[in-house]
Structures are given as structure tokens and as C-alpha cells.
Regions:
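N-terminal signal-anchor transmembrane alpha helix
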Residues: 31-58
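Hydrophobic alpha-helical transmembrane segments
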Residues: 89-112, 129, 133
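Membrane-interface loop-to-helix entry segments
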Residues: 79-101, 148-160
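Juxtamembrane boundary at the C-terminal end of a transmembrane helix
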Residues: 203-214
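Membrane-interfacial, low-structure loops and terminal tails that flank and connect transmembrane helices
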Residues: 13-29, 173-189
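Membrane-interface helix caps and helix-loop-helix hairpins in membrane proteins
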Residues: 138-150
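Single conserved hydrophobic/aromatic residue that forms the stacking wall/gate
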Residues: 1-9
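Extracytosolic (periplasmic/ER-lumenal) interhelical loops and adjacent juxtamembrane/interface segments
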Residues: 55-90
Length: 214
């Protein structure tokens, strides 16, 4: 006996597939928002600690900080360099002002809030600026200063997660409408880029400071 699938039979199947796809998409968006929250939390914690340490150094520039582990890992060495305060105040103060906004956005997204495109584009540009600034600070520490700050590295990791999570969320929600980027995210290449950047940074640190930190 031959059975044929009628339009009436196909509708429930189509509806089920849409629900499954919608559920999968929702989970991806929630994960992206969670990564924004984790990155913002790490960055805010690092900014808070660095702000306290900058006040300690303001009182005594020769103070030994808790994260002064050795010559290679020294917060005070980095903090006493001009690049730690190019605007006239510690860079960590910028994090204290901006990262609570990212925390709020992440919590709101996890709760199901929807923001207008202009707002999310503003957040995206902020994440790009933050990542570029973090990259510049890492370059200065790695090349110019010749020492690394553990809490600065924590802040860098947080900014990388914020940029990754926010970009992924905006692409999935069509805030950033670009077919190429959508395919890039759907195929997981953005995750590969994130892992590659993290691996390259770790290898660069080990190549230069490995003997001093291991």
C-alpha cells in the first residue's frame, strides 16, 4: 500500500521543525549573551583590582603589589609606564565606567530583552574600541615594557569574550546583516578565530617569558 503525505499532514511536521530550529537559535543567542556576561564580569573585576592598585601606586610609586610575581609578571612595572594612563588617569577607570553597561546589556539579553538596532550597534562599536585598546595595551606590555600584568591579561581575555559574544549575538539577531558573516558564524569559524587568537597570545607569552613564569 502506498501512502501519500498530504498538505494537512505536512503542516505539523513543518511547525515542529520550525520550533526545533527556533529553539536551537535561541540557545545560541543565550550562550552568546552568557559569554558577554562572563567577559564583562572578568573585565570589571580586573578593572576594580587595577583601580585599587593604581591608588596604591599613587601614594607610593615603589610599592610592591600583590600581583608583582616576578620581573616578567609585574603589575607595578606596567602601571608605572605612561601607557597605563595616556588620558591622564588609569586605564582601569575606563573599565570601571564602561563595563557595568556591558554587564547590564548581557543580563537584559539573558532575560529576553530586545534592544533597538542603533543601541546594539553602539554596543558593538564600544566592544570593537575596547578590544583594540586592549590589544594596544598588550602590545605595549609585551614589546615596549617587557613585562606583563596578570590582571591586565584578565581584562584582555574579558574584552575578547565580550567582542566574540556580542558580535555573534548581533549576527544571529540580524543586527549585523551580512550573508557572509552569517555563514561564518553558522559554520563556527568565529569560534575557531577566537581559539586561534587565544592560542597565539599564549604561545607568544610562553616564547618570550616562558622560562620566567613556568
Amino acid at each position: 500500500e502506498i501512502y501519500t503525505l498530504s498538505l494537512h499532514d505536512a503542516l505539523p511536521i513543518s511547525s515542529l521543525l520550525r520550533k526545533r530550529l527556533s529553539g536551537k537559535e535561541s540557545k545560541r543567542q543565550q550562550l552568546a549573551a552568557l559569554l558577554i556576561l562572563v567577559g564583562s564580569g572578568l573585565g570589571l573585576l580586573a578593572s576594580f583590582v587595577l583601580s585599587i592598585e593604581s591608588l596604591t601606586l599613587a601614594k607610593n610609586s615603589h610599592a610592591v603589589l600583590n600581583c608583582d610575581l616576578n620581573a616578567a609578571m609585574s603589575c607595578s612595572t606596567v602601571a608605572n609606564h605612561w601607557s597605563a594612563a595616556p588620558l591622564g588617569f588609569p586605564n582601569s577607570f575606563i573599565g570601571m565606567m564602561t563595563l557595568p553597561v556591558m554587564v547590564t546589556i548581557a543580563v537584559a539579553l539573558l532575560a529576553g530583552a530586545k534592544f533597538p538596532k542603533w543601541f546594539m550597534w553602539g554596543a558593538q562599536l564600544g566592544a570593537v574600541a575596547g578590544l583594540l585598546f586592549a590589544g594596544w595595551m598588550f602590545y605595549m606590555s609585551y614589546v615596549e615594557i617587557g613585562a606583563l600584568c596578570p590582571w591586565c591579561l584578565t581584562l584582555d581575555a574579558g574584552m575578547l569574550l565580550i567582542f566574540y559574544g556580542l558580535t555573534r549575538h548581533n549576527v544571529l539577531n540580524k543586527i549585523i546583516e551580512h550573508r557572509g558573516l552569517r555563514r561564518f558564524v553558522d559554520q563556527g569559524y568565529d569560534t575557531l578565530v577566537l581559539a586561534s587568537v587565544a592560542a597565539l597570545v599564549i604561545m607568544a607569552i610562553l616564547a618570550k617569558f616562558g622560562s620566567q613564569i613556568i
